[in-house]
């Protein structure tokens, strides 16, 4: 079932009024990979009437008022990605296209969409509460360095003047807000819900205090300290509030919601999604973002990889939840009934596919300890379970109508070597690879990899060798390709040339999967970029801030110039 986007669609459902209206910077795609559809269906399954306004024109009241006034609240998200990332390249050039917009047209969402949409709502519905959510709001919930303006900005909750902010994967927190407002109409009573950020005029009596907005604005190393505290103490099992002074007020983060149980996760993904672009938006053109996920399966939520540059660890947490085999197989059966299904499940996974079935007894009871699970080596307490993942893939392949099952990306290759015999999994993985397996070594230089919290590049080479050798023995022409990042903190010309030489010597091809590091809010790497120090060691870090040099670093690794750059 599509959620309504117009009054006419409301009438067809017999709804005279909506309880909740969700506003998003993406086109409305009714698929579980799109946050608004996910939250919307979850709320409807609990008896609430929910409508969606996607990519409203923020210059007029026409779109934002078309569904009327909601009974409970507006929910606002910039979309699946930060609006500044959606609108600008790593060279700060305005993007001309947008994969989340019909027809791929750029410019359909405003910069800092969360703030703009909230201001629009407050202008025409000043008495209706506004609740922020999604990746942009979640990673900007405290004072944060904003690369596009090159300054520290206040919490998006303060800047937008919204009423509440839900961080992380927000199903249960949003449901709690809806239930309390439905019973009492009192937004103040929602401030006790886990997974919620709110502001207070008085200093909280308990919790961890982060360096203030003024402190981190004046002293970048205080920002690194704040990020470290936020990373270690944002954990459902530690149950500790975190707060930060911003001017005369305090931004308060309640402890996060606990990870969803397997039963809860199973129910979520089997809600009645259409898995299509809503007709209202489909008539405007194709939405490219659905093409890569339409026939994919999310099996895992969360990741304990702790890559410094990754926003998903900060958003989905290090606690891994995974769906039952029965739930996943049922979703596959649903996909096989789609008219345009051609027999291929394009991907099975999540942030890291081969964490399916894995766990850690310490993290599951006491929370994240002050060590990294996979860096510098895989912790002995972590339990790999690649057999269960392979069993899942084999079961999917047996379903009538399924000809191919692929794992296209999201494999943490160092985790495979935690098994007694890595070749057992690698051999099976060959069967489920669509020609090329995309891995993410990210760099080659030991210093840069250390700052990224990534394994030594030798493990990537060993995995690549074993995979391609086994594929050849099996009569398969399948290969491993790598993703790389340039311009990350710690990389100068020496490290960049090291990466170039590594590619030339070991890969045998010129990779196109190279991106320039973008300092996005809320990540450890961004804290390094702004502060010039590693938040966890306090060591000084070289940071290349020149856009011109960063672009040249990419050209150097892409072999667009003959010879190495001399610096």
From Swiss-Prot:
It holds the Pfam family DUF3362. Its cofactor is [4Fe-4S] cluster. It comes from the Bacteria. GO terms for molecular function: 4 iron, 4 sulfur cluster binding; catalytic activity; iron ion binding. Keywords: 4Fe-4S, Iron, Iron-sulfur, Metal-binding, S-adenosyl-L-methionine. [4Fe-4S] cluster binds at residues 303, 307, 310. Residues 288-560 form the Radical SAM core domain. InterPro entries: Elp3/MiaA/NifB-like_rSAM, rSAM, rSAM_horseshoe, UPF0313, UPF0313_C, UPF0313_N. CDD domains: Radical_SAM (cd01335). SMART domains: Elp3. Binds 1 [4Fe-4S] cluster. The cluster is coordinated with 3 cysteines and an exchangeable S-adenosyl-L-methionine. Belongs to the UPF0313 family. This is UPF0313 protein TM_0337. It comes from Thermotoga maritima (strain ATCC 43589 / DSM 3109 / JCM 10099 / NBRC 100826 / MSB8). The lineage of its organism: Bacteria, Thermotogati, Thermotogota, Thermotogae, Thermotogales.
